[in-house]
Amino acid sequence: MVAKDYPFYLTVKRANCALDVEAASSPAKETEEPSNKRVKPLSRVTSLANLIPPVRATPLKRFSQTLQRSISFRSDSRPDLFSPRPWSRNTPAANTKRRDSKLWSETFDVCVNHMLTSKEIKRQEAIFELSKGEEDLIEDLKLAKKAYHDPMLKLSIMTEQELNQIFGTLDSLIPLHEDLLRRLQEVRKSDGSTEHVGHILVGWLPCLNSYDSYCSNQVAAKALLDHKKQDHRVQDFLQRCLESPFSRKLDLWNFLDIPRSRLVKYPLLLREILRHTPNDHPDQQHLEEAINIIQGIVAEINIKTGESECQYYKERLIYLEGGQRDSLIDNSRVLCCHGELKNNRGVKLHVFLFQEVLVITRAITHNEQLCYQLYRQPIPVMDLVLEDLQDGEVRLGGSIRGAFSNNERIKNFFRVSFKNGSQSQSHSLQANDSFNKQQWLNCIRQAKEKVTCAGKAGVLSSEACFILSPNGSRVSQGETMIEQMDQSDSESDCSMDTSEISIDCERMEQTNPCENEKQIETNV
């Protein structure tokens, strides 16, 4: 226990001692009190008695138990405004289905210490992880269809057209991975070891090109699913599934996003097998070829997914006047980043940074769909002026100061502006935190550098070396993905979906802008 916990612990301990004394002396007091005196209900006394920890519990354990029970007591005293949740103390906890995570050496009864070297054991573990991951993926895909798609269709919770949009080509992925699993199991020896996998992967990996349509549909699928969650029947069904053991406390989108997450893990899995494969092993060359194949497939799918995302948002832009239309928007194939920011009056704006133009919008609902109404004129990236406003710095006179109290410090602001002839505009935008602000600054700077380089070269290519990261965004192939796989999405009022940005400021400053084609990365 850390030092700061001691005062609270001692307070709880003294309270427990007081309860012990009160409980011990209560029988004697009852004989002396008048009969008309109000007595606490027995249920309340029992609840208080539950606060007393076991005598033999250690101090740390006693503190934990007391805290949990006191929380339970407070929640029980309130009216039941909401339906019980599986994490509530007053309802039996559901037995969440857990997945076995045994290692290869734990699964097969072999004397590995005498038969195989340490490096070979690690190689077998990596191959087994690949095979076990296929089993888990197949199980999850079948679960998504059986537990979500089919019941919602049968109960008419969603129409068949809506379900087809949300689930996409998920059905076609199941036999694809069943084929790889079958091949891996066929070459596994009776003792559980596998000698060669490289030739299998080289022959099977091209099948992953079928992921193209599934991944390209995910942006529209996620938007429709979020919209349908406003329907009470849909929300109730999904909540019941979430509380059921089979879901492992994962929502529907987690299951729908598993194929994409699996796709971007293949390069890592194959590199791990290659790392533990001897140089003179026949698999060495095949594994190197397989890695090149999967990297090319993922990069190509990522480009097409980015173009699909860009097109999706372009179709949902609403122009108040014809003068707001810009060919730079129509010709954009890449959406560098987008997200919610606030202006100096606290108004929420949704900002899109396309490859050559910055578009500031307001999110609105149009025909029961989330759309984005343009807020003033689009700003060409070539003419855009970016300014980093330091925390507490007032550069716009009273325009920012008036939006805050005298005691509140201005934080996480930056300004974008441009002037072209008689047209000029300036926007002071606030991110939700310093990290998010830095992401925006880096993304805009890199977009400007890319446009500048393209202007000198006379061409602007929309194809950069991106791969899908496990959190659904794009990262450059030069960036390691191990840390990306451990990151989780976070929601905030000023969130940002960064599709092609980098927070590596030092590298950005040290690199020649016109040689920086691989620099754009993603950090969510």
Curated annotation (Swiss-Prot):
Name of a matching Pfam family: SOS1_NGEF_PH
An example GO BP is: positive regulation of Rho protein signal transduction
Q: Which residues form the PH domain?
A: 290-448
The subcellular localization recorded is:
Cytoplasm
Q: Where is the DH domain?
A: 121-303
Protein keywords: Cytoplasm, Guanine-nucleotide releasing factor
Q: In UniProt terms, what function does this protein have?
A: Acts as a guanine nucleotide exchange factor (GEF) for RhoA and RhoB GTPases.
Protein name (record): Rho guanine nucleotide exchange factor 3
Q: Which organism is it from?
A: Gallus gallus
